A protein has these predicted regions:
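Short phosphate-binding loop-to-helix
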Residues: 49, 55-99, 106-114, 261-273, ...
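Donor-nucleotide binding loops and adjacent catalytic segments primarily
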Residues: 245, 357-430
Length: 535
C-alpha cells in the first residue's frame, strides 16, 4: 500500500451500544477487530492512528504499539467527522487519509485494499463506502396504493470508511464517489440486532462440498450432497466441481449455491481455506487428503474405498452393508443413508390388493438407456392388465427423444414420462411396483414401501448390497442377454401373485431413513466445533 495514513476514530460516547468498541464480538473486541484489519492492510503499524475519548481504547492502542490521540471532549458525527479528523492529523506527513471506522466488522483487509486501489484511480474525489438499495415504492391515491416505482439505482452510505487527500478537502472542490460494499459485508452496527447478526455471521464456518457428476457417472453424488447442504444453514456452503462436469455445475447453480468450476480442484479447495471439506467423489488419494488436513480442514468422505479414506476424519460408506476396510473413522450401512428433502413429508404406501401403477426409474442420466429397454419388456403385461406406467428420468437423460418417440407410437396410452421433476416421491406414492437401478433410489423406494426389481448399471452399483430379497427387493444383477426374460418373469409374478408381493412389502416396510440425515449432519458439524475448541 502507498504511504497513506489509516485513521480509526474510536469515540466511546458515540457508541450505539454501551461500551460497544470494547465489547467482545465473537471473542474479539470491536476496536481490536478494526486494528487487526488495519494491520493486515497497512505496510506497518506506523501508518495507523487511533483518535479516541477513552482511556480503555488508548490502552488498547498502546498494547498494539499504535499511535493514538485522546481527547475526552471529542465528539463526531457524519457531518463533522472529516473536518475533526483533519484537525487531529496536521502534523502527519501523509497526504492520503483512509478514515476507517470499527462499526462494520464484516469488512476485511481485502475490501480495504480494493477500495484504496479504486481511490488511486480518482482525481479530486473522496471515496465513500455505500451499499446498494432496491426500493419498491408506492404512492397513495385516494387511500389506495397506486402503481409501484421500482428503483434499482439507489445506494445508501454506510459508515465504514472515507478515503481522501488532504489538499482536495482543503480546496473544497471534490466529488463524492461511491465504493459499493457487498450486501453480505455491509452490516453497520447501530443496535443489538445488528450486533447479533454480525456475530452469527462471524461464527459461521466455511464448508466446501467437493463433488462430481455427469452422464457417465450419474448424478447421485450431486443430489446426495445437495440434500446434506440444505440442512446446513448456520455456515457458509460452497461447492467445488471440475469444470468438465457441466451437468453437475448446472444442477448445483440452479439451487442458488455458490459453485466454483475449476480445472484444479485441489488448488481451489486449498485457496478457499475451508474449515470442513466434504468429498463426495468416490475413491480419494492419500496425498490429496493429507494436503487438506495439513491446511487445517476437517475431512468427511462419502462412498470412499480409496486409500485416502484412512486419513479422513469420517468416512460414510452407507451403500455397503458389510465393512470392507478397517478403521474407527468408517461408518457402514443403511443407517447412514440420507434421503432428499422431499421425502421428509412423503407418505409410505399401504399395501394395495392389486397393481394399478408401476414405476420405472434408472437415475439422473441412465447412460445405458435401461428405461426404454424395460418399458418394452413390461409394456404388453401392463397393457393386458390396464396398469399405468410411470417413467421418471433426470435432467441428464440424453435418450429423452427416443423414448418420447416410442411412447407416441405406442397404442397403449397409459404411459407417463416425468422428466427432471422435483417431486419423485409423489409419483412413488401412486406406484405399487418399481423397476430401478441399484443406486440411492433404492432407499427412496424402501422409504415409500415399494417392492422393486433392481438392475445395476455397472460393477460399482452391483457391489451395493442393500437391495436383497430379505429387504423386499428382487435383485437381477447387471444387465445381460438373459435379463429381459428374468425381468418379464419377476414382473409378471409381482403383478399376479398378491401373496408374494405382500411378503416383499412386509420386508421392505420395516425400513425408514427419515431421521438419518439430521444425525449425519450433526456428526459432520461436530467436527467443526471440535476443531474450533482445539484451536
Amino acid at each position: 500500500m502507498k504511504d497513506a495514513l489509516i485513521v480509526i476514530p474510536a469515540i466511546k460516547k458515540n457508541a450505539a451500544i454501551p461500551d460497544q468498541l470494547i465489547k467482545k464480538l465473537d471473542g474479539i473486541t470491536l476496536i481490536q477487530r478494526a486494528i487487526n484489519t488495519a494491520l493486515n492492510f497497512a505496510n506497518n503499524a506506523n501508518q495507523i492512528l487511533i483518535i479516541t475519548d477513552s482511556d480503555e481504547i488508548a490502552l488498547i492502542a498502546q498494547r498494539n504499539k499504535i499511535a493514538y490521540k485522546k481527547d475526552q471532549k471529542l465528539s463526531l458525527n457524519s457531518k463533522n467527522i472529516i473536518q475533526v479528523v483533519l484537525s487531529k492529523i496536521s502534523e502527519f506527513e501523509q497526504e492520503d487519509i483512509f478514515l476507517y471506522r470499527a462499526n462494520t466488522p464484516l469488512i476485511d483487509s481485502d475490501d480495504l485494499k480494493s477500495a484504496y486501489l479504486r481511490f488511486l484511480e480518482l482525481n479530486n474525489s473522496i471515496l465513500v463506502s455505500v451499499k446498494k438499495e432496491r426500493r419498491d415504492v408506492f404512492s397513495i391515491q385516494n387511500g389506495k396504493l397506486d402503481k409501484s416505482i421500482i428503483r434499482n439505482d439507489l445506494c445508501e452510505e454506510i459508515g465504514a470508511f472515507y478515503i481522501f487527500n488532504k489538499s482536495v478537502i482543503e480546496n473544497d472542490h471534490y466529488e463524492r464517489i461511491p465504493f459499493i460494499i457487498p450486501d453480505n459485508k455491509s452490516i453497520e452496527i447501530n443496535n443489538y440486532q445488528d450486533w447479533w447478526i454480525c456475530e452469527k455471521i462471524l461464527q459461521r464456518k466455511k464448508v466446501v462440498f467437493h463433488v462430481f457428476g455427469d452422464f457417465k457417472i450419474g448424478m447421485g453424488h450431486i443430489f446426495h450432497s445437495l440434500s446434506l447442504a440444505h440442512e446446513i444453514t448456520n455456515h457458509e456452503v460452497i461447492f467445488v466441481c471440475n469444470k468438465k462436469y457441466e451437468l453437475a455445475v448446472k444442477e448445483i447453480a440452479s439451487m442458488d449455491y455458490r459453485v466454483i468450476s475449476t480445472e484444479n480442484e485441489e488448488k481451489t479447495i486449498l485457496d478457499l481455506k475451508p474449515d470442513l471439506i466434504v468429498n463426495d467423489i468416490l475413491n480419494t488419494k492419500v496425498n490429496f487428503i493429507k494436503k487438506i488436513k495439513k491446511n487445517g480442514a476437517m475431512v468427511v468422505n462419502f462412498e470412499d474405498l480409496g486409500d485416502g479414506a484412512y486419513h479422513a476424519d469420517m468416512v460414510f460408506n452407507e451403500l455397503y452393508e458389510k465393512p470392507i476396510k478397517n478403521g474407527n473413522n468408517f461408518y457402514w450401512g443403511h443407517k447412514y443413508i440420507s434421503l432428499r428433502n422431499e421425502f421428509d413429508n412423503a407418505k409410505p404406501n399401504l399395501f394395495k390388493e392389486s397393481v394399478s401403477e408401476v414405476l420405472i426409474m434408472f437415475g439422473g442420466t441412465d447412460q445405458n438407456n435401461f428405461t426404454l429397454k424395460i418399458l418394452k419388456i413390461i409394456l404388453s403385461i401392463c397393457q393386458t392388465r390396464n396398469i399405468a406406467i410411470n417413467i421418471v428420468c433426470g435432467s441428464g437423460y440424453i435418450h429423452k427423444d427416443k423414448i418420447l418417440d416410442f411412447i407416441s407410437k405406442s397404442l397403449y396410452k397409459k404411459i407417463s414420462l416425468h422428466h427432471a421433476i422435483a417431486n419423485i416421491s409423489g409419483v412413488m406414492e401412486r406406484s405399487q411396483i418399481a423397476i430401478s437401478s441399484n443406486g440411492r433410489s433404492i432407499y427412496e423406494l424402501a422409504q415409500i414401501n415399494i417392492p422393486s426389481i433392481i438392475i445395476s448399471h455397472h460393477e460399482r452399483e452391483f457391489n451395493h448390497d442393500f437391495a436383497k430379497s430379505k429387504r423386499g427387493f428382487i435383485n437381477i444383477g447387471m444387465y445381460t442377454e438373459r435379463t429381459s426374460a428374468k425381468v418379464e418373469k419377476e414382473f409378471l409374478r409381482l403383478v399376479c401373485d398378491k401373496d408374494y408381493r405382500l411378503n416383499l412389502f412386509k420386508k421392505i416396510s420395516k425400513y425408514s431413513f427419515i431421521k438419518n440425515k439430521i444425525n449425519i449432519v450433526s456428526s459432520i458439524l461436530s467436527l467443526i466445533e471440535r476443531s474450533h475448541e482445539i484451536s
